[in-house]
Amino acid sequence: AAELVNAGIDVRWCDTHGEQCHFKALLVETAGNGRFLSVLGSANFTRRNLDDFNLETDVTLSLPADHALAISMTTWFDGLWENRNGRHFSVPYADFADERPKLRWTYRLMEATGWSSF
């Protein structure tokens, strides 16, 4: 997550209390061309999962940004991101950030080799 933050991407964590937050959703609205892209499924967004080291099931949707499904998915995501309607789902990156060098280098090794537990 630190790589994303350092690249200027906003990151929030699911605010869990013993349970796991397991869903994966990538939503991209591309500026300028009015397109919406979403990847939903079981794959973690890591080399191990995206380079076919694990059997995963995902679906990719490419829609006009003003399509009803794109609007609905964006509303759903924004509700989780912004804790809307009195429901609490996420917290800022700083709440769970852990940038210890040992963790960073373990992550780098696991990503480079495709050997990981995530």
Protein language model features and the residues they cover:
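PLD/PLD-like phosphodiesterase catalytic module centered on the HKD motif
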Residues: 1-118
